[in-house]
A protein has these predicted regions:
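An N-terminal amphipathic alpha-helical segment
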Residues: 1-100
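Compositionally biased, intrinsically disordered low-complexity regions enriched in proline and serine
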Residues: 26, 43-45, 112, 125, ...
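Short, aromatic/basic amphipathic alpha-helical patches
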Residues: 100-115
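C-terminal edge-of-domain segments
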Residues: 114-139
Length: 139
């Protein structure tokens, strides 16, 4: 199933990236947390990359995988996103461990909504690509 996103919805999603709650959460995490969890680090890096790339969705390029899932990193990752008031992400991770990570994410109450694309500002994306295919999840 392909999701067709209108310009209005795309702008609403873009606004989500810049929401005060998410910005405050991740800036506070960066500035005050001396020992962030691995899940918080995954979430922070995703927020930072999405913001720097001016992505129109909250893009996650790398999910916790392998032993990290058993160690609770996915749970920490979802908790950090929830604390930042992020309720939708697009996963563009293309690693070989993706299926295990997708199942672990869904087990942490995420709902796989379908496939989608995230548009990045080509000036802020080193690869120069604008549209990246991914999986859309809701919490």
């Amino acid at each position: 199933m392909k999701i067709n996103i209108t310009d209005e919805i795309r702008q609403e999603i873009l606004d989500t990236l810049n929401r005060d709650t998410a910005k405050e959460y991740f800036e506070k995490l960066r500035d005050t947390e001396k020992n962030p969890t691995r899940g918080q680090v995954y979430a922070y890096r995703s927020w930072e990359q999405s913001t720097e790339d001016r992505a129109d969705m909250f893009e996650v390029r790398a999910l916790p995988w392998g032993s990290q899932i058993k160690d609770g990193v996915m749970k920490e990752f979802v908790a950090a996103l929830t604390a930042a008031d992020i309720d939708e992400i697009i996963v563009t991770d293309q690693s070989t461990a993706l299926m295990e990570s997708v199942h672990a994410l869904v087990a942490e109450v995420a709902y796989l909504e379908g496939v989608g694309t995230v548009t990045r500002d080509p000036l802020h994306d080193p690869s120069g690509r604008r549209e990246i295919k991914g999986l859309v999840f809701r919490f």
